[in-house]
């Protein structure tokens, strides 16, 4: 959850997801495939799932190892942000605990480049259609 977590934050996240869904619908109506890149927990995942229940909706969790994630974090320009580094660790722990409890395909992207990760997602989409 975002910090600090408040009702206002929940409302803003819900509006953000609603707007993403509406924009996605514009593209779906014209025959395009749509990917929404978002960091979601159970509540937003349910919101997306409900909105797209009549579409071919798939969810993916990109979950590299904590070691790989922290290495990527440390290679960033703003790597001196200890609060964000701690948040990264907390999110990894949370998603690791939830990974088998929600309806999404988990991809370990530890050793994958961006292009390889995209290829893996496409392979998963082809295997489930």
What spans do the regions from the language model cover?
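Short catalytic-loop micro-motif centered on adjacent basic/acidic residues
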Residues: 34-37, 106-108
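C-terminal alpha-helix
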Residues: 120-128
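Conserved substrate/cofactor phosphate-moiety recognition/catalytic segment
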Residues: 1-19
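Conserved phosphate-donor/acceptor-positioning beta-strand/loop module used by diverse small-molecule
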Residues: 38, 53-74
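Conserved ATPase "switch" residues in P-loop NTPase domains
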Residues: 24, 28
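Short, electropositive alpha-helical surface patch
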Residues: 43-60, 122
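Small-molecule kinase domains that catalyze NTP-dependent phosphoryl transfer to phosphate-bearing small molecules
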Residues: 75-120
């Amino acid at each position: 959850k975002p910090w600090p977590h408040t009702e206002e934050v929940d409302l803003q996240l819900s509006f953000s997801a609603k707007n993403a869904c509406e924009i996605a619908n514009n593209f779906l109506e014209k025959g395009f495939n749509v990917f929404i890149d978002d960091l979601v927990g159970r509540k937003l995942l349910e919101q997306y799932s409900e909105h797209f229940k009549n579409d071919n909706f798939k969810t993916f969790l990109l979950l590299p190892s904590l070691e790989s994630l922290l290495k990527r974090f440390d290679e960033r320009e703003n790597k001196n942000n200890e609060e964000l580094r701690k948040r990264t660790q907390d999110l990894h722990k949370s998603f690791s605990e939830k990974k088998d409890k929600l309806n999404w395909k988990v991809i370990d992207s530890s050793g994958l480049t961006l292009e390889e990760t995209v290829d893996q997602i496409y392979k998963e989409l082809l295997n489930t259609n």
